[in-house]
A protein has these predicted regions:
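Charged phosphate-binding loop/patch that engages nucleotide di/tri-phosphates or the phosphate backbone
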Residues: 131, 135-160
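Functional cleft and adjacent loop/helix regions within the main domain
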Residues: 40-44, 50, 86, 96, ...
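Active-site-adjacent beta-strand/loop module that shapes the phosphate/pyrophosphate-binding cleft
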Residues: 81-119, 131, 153
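Residues that scaffold the ATP/ADP-binding catalytic core of kinase and kinase-like folds
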Residues: 35, 51, 141
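The catalytic Nudix box helix
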Residues: 43-78, 94, 134
Length: 160
């Protein structure tokens, strides 16, 4: 039987403040993630749809998760490659230099039964918050597999 690998695409936003680089990470919404912090944060990303270009998915997911594409197009994106998360999901990622005010976060929502077996459907945001982190703090907060994407970004910026 052919195994289908889940594939996501996302964008690691970064900004440079004087000599320091910061990256924007998002925290997933919903009750499962409510009390999780270190290792729970992520680049804004989501599932690639059938027939969708991977970079187009990354831009769409940025808008769905933070509420804006920030004027980005595929031409603005710097490829960081892909990583495989513990779940087996492959995450393709790009980087882009843009500023974003986390207070402007407007995420799409999803519906799930909560509490379990209650028969009650509730809406939750895909992302409940976004924050800028310096590289050391980002490394503590980000999904462990995605830390490699952060390292690739920093290496690329050091070489530029």
């Amino acid at each position: 039987m052919l195994e289908v690998t889940a594939t996501s695409a996302g964008i690691m936003l970064f900004r440079r403040e004087e000599a320091a680089t910061e990256v924007l990470l998002v925290h997933p919404g919903g009750p499962f993630w409510a009390r999780k912090d270190n290792g729970a944060w992520s680049v804004p990303k989501g599932q690639v749809e059938d027939g969708e270009e991977v970079s187009a998915c990354a831009l769409r997911e940025l808008e769905e998760e933070i509420g804006s594409r920030l004027g980005l197009t595929a031409a603005d994106l710097m490829e960081l490659g892909s990583v495989r998360q513990k779940s087996g999901k492959v995450v393709h990622c790009w980087a882009a230099e843009r500023d974003f005010d986390p207070a402007e976060l407007h995420s799409e929502t999803f519906t799930m039964e909560w509490p379990p077996r209650s028969g009650r459907q509730q809406d939750f945001p895909e992302v409940d918050r976004a924050e800028w982190f310096d590289p050391d703090e980002a490394r503590r907060r980000i999904n462990p597999a995605q830390a490699e994407l952060l390292d690739r970004l920093l290496a690329s910026l050091d070489g530029s």
